[in-house]
């Protein structure tokens, strides 16, 4: 019998698994009881939770379905979902969790016609993705090569070795008779034949109709025989793990099915291609062929010089659709730093739908528009940007023109926009919450730029604050959530307010955790004023001095895996998600003029709502 605190851990861990990972198809009360008992056994012994998922073999050879043989946005989104669950379990249970992904390529290698080199490239790239989220110690991708039972075998012998060491000869010999006496087994067999006929259609195209049917029967039977051998191997080596599955199973306490994507269907990234539908703001999981044949303007998005996913836009006219199809789309990182570059002369930014731009910025953190028609006057940018909301009003107007003729510019510390509003805005944290006054987004337009050191290019730095929140151990993340800093601007004009913020909070847009932190060293840009910020600890369970805390935050946010160096060019328009991004700038020598605007948050209690402005004016 566990004490109340440990029993609460069991409930918390169960909720995380049920809420974030498990599909719960045909769930039974017995299945829930069994799951909780497995978790209870770990907690009773202060043991690490162990999860096992046989999956992620390789990309299919069918290029009607996928973009290539390497992992892409699909795999990244699934792995990031796993990392999120791992961090949340760590936050409520200090021993944490180890999540094993057992790559089952060798189990089925004789039937899927994928080169061994492609499998190893695929697995290596998966590990790099996990490493980019700083989770390699807890999300492990393993294979037969990691187990003594397969010592002495070469990798092309693992397929046969699995059958010889862990197979059930009687199951294989009596397969036809067993299939006729077990409806579930027969349905699995028929389902495999149907799936593999479609998945391997290019490989099977050289066969006659009769030979193709024979080969499909051989493949379906062979995969079921190998699957049974794999089950025996996994039971022998991972018998103490909670067994997860990418296939649909009733939740009765044996195998727990997963939805890999937010879409509640049993789809896998190695048989699919991702498309971000900017009209809805959601990823769509489907075959490459179906995406390309869907309505709208479909653009390939590149990352690390290879196809990564698709992007769907809409156009008002056929002519505009043709122009938008010429856009080049690239990502700096796996899921942040989108660049849309026009390769067509005289394409205005108004050709892009405002709602779709907002969805892109919300999802990818920053969106750079390059090569579009330039704004000749601030009012042009103001008129365009205010189509989708009211701008934050400053004493000097809605557009902040940050022009400098200085030859040397110091680095701009990391921060987020309007973290310390000027006193004339009347923002008081006793009256307003973070989401009441913090702009959801802002834009930076590079009107002119000359850099004497770097060939006309200077870098603005952005940090993926959402990735930062899952890159740290869940236990530390919660300590940072319970740590608050007071930021006090060191200036007399325009008298910005001192504000208090936790280091980790929830994004009002996406509801994901984000890091909220500003570097105290250096000068921050507040309208046309530069000032330094003093930070002091208001509350913290782990820190009593600012210096070691700032050192740790510099380690987290200074990680190159989280940072994007935006090589700003003249005419670039940078749209920024102010909640999921921290911004800074590198030092440079030269001249630069930037125009900046922020949109008011869509809160009924915004300081710029008429009723609040009237109240503030009366008080003034």
Regions found by a protein language model. Give the residues of each.
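Short loop/turn segments at strand-loop or loop-helix junctions that form parts
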Residues: 45-64, 100-109, 141-149, 444-447, ...
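N- or domain-start disorder-to-order transition segments that initiate the globular core
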Residues: 1-52, 301-358
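Active-site environment of non-heme Fe oxygenases that use a 2-His-1-carboxylate facial triad
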Residues: 304-348, 405-620
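Long C-terminal appendages of very large multidomain proteins
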Residues: 258-300
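A substrate-binding/cap region within the structured catalytic cores of diverse enzymes
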Residues: 105-264
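Histidine-anchored nucleotide/phosphate-binding helix
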Residues: 74-94, 352-357
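Terminal domain-start leader segments
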Residues: 36, 327-421
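Hydrophobic beta-strand segments of well-ordered beta-sheets in folded domains
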Residues: 47-52, 93-105, 139, 232, ...
């Amino acid at each position: 019998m566990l004490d109340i605190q440990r029993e609460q851990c069991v409930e918390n861990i169960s909720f995380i698994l049920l809420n974030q990972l498990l599909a719960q198809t045909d769930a039974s009360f017995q299945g829930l009881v069994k799951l909780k008992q497995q978790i209870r056994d770990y907690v009773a012994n202060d043991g690490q939770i162990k999860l096992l998922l046989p999956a992620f073999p390789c990309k299919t050879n069918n290029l009607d379905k996928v973009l290539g043989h390497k992992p892409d946005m699909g795999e990244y989104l699934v792995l990031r979902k796993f990392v999120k669950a791992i961090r949340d379990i760590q936050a409520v249970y200090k021993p944490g969790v180890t999540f094993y992904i057992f790559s089952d390529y060798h189990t089925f290698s004789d039937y899927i016609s994928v080169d061994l080199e492609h499998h190893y490239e695929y697995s290596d790239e998966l590990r790099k993705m996990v490493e980019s989220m700083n989770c390699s110690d807890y999300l492990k991708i393993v294979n037969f090569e990691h187990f003594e039972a397969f010592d002495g075998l070469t990798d092309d012998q693992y397929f046969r070795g699995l059958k010889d060491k862990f197979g059930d000869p009687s199951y294989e010999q009596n397969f036809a008779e067993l299939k006729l006496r077990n409806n579930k087994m027969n349905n699995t067999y028929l389902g495999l034949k149907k799936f593999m006929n479609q998945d391997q259609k290019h490989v099977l195209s050289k066969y006659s109709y009769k030979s193709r049917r024979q080969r499909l029967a051989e493949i379906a039977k062979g995969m079921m025989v190998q699957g049974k051998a794999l089950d025996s191997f996994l039971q022998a080596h991972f018998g103490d793990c909670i067994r997860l599955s990418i296939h649909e199973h009733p939740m009765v306490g044996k195998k727990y099915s997963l939805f890999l994507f937010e879409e509640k269907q049993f789809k896998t990234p190695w048989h699919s291609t991702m498309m971000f539908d900017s009209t809805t703001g959601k990823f769509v999981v489907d075959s490459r062929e179906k995406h390309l044949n869907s309505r709208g303007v479909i653009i390939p998005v590149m990352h690390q010089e290879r196809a990564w996913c698709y992007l769907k836009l809409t156009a008002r006219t056929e002519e505009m659709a043709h122009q938008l199809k010429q856009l080049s789309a690239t990502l700096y990182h796996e899921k942040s730093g989108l660049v849309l570059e026009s390769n067509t002369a005289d394409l205005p930014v108004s050709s892009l739908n405002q709602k779709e731009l907002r969805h892109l910025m919300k999802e990818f953190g920053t969106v750079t528009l390059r090569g579009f028609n330039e704004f000749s006057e601030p009012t042009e940018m103001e008129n365009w940007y205010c189509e989708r909301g009211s701008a934050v009003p400053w004493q000097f107007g809605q557009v902040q023109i940050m022009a400098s003729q200085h030859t040397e510019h110091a680095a701009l510390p990391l921060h987020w926009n309007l973290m310390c509003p000027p006193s004339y805005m009347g923002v008081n944290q006793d009256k307003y919450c973070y989401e009441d006054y913090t702009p959801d987004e802002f834009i930076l337009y590079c009107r002119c730029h000359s850099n004497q050191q770097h060939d006309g290019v200077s870098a603005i730095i952005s940090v993926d604050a959402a990735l930062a929140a899952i890159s740290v151990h869940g236990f530390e993340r919660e300590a940072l959530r319970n740590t608050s800093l007071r930021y006090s601007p060191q200036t007399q004009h325009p008298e910005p307010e001192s504000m208090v913020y936790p280091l980790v909070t929830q994004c009002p847009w996406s509801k994901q955790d984000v890091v909220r932190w500003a570097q105290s060293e250096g000068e921050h840009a507040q309208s046309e004023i530069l000032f330094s910020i003093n930070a002091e600890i208001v509350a913290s369970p782990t820190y009593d001095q600012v210096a070691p805390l700032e050192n740790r935050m510099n380690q987290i946010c200074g990680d190159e895996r989280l940072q994007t160096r935006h090589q700003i060019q003249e005419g670039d328009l940078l749209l920024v998600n102010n909640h999921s991004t921290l911004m800074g700038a590198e030092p440079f020598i030269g001249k630069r003029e930037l125009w900046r605007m922020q949109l008011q948050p869509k809160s009924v209690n915004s300081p710029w709502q008429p009723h609040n402005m009237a109240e503030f004016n009366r008080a003034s």
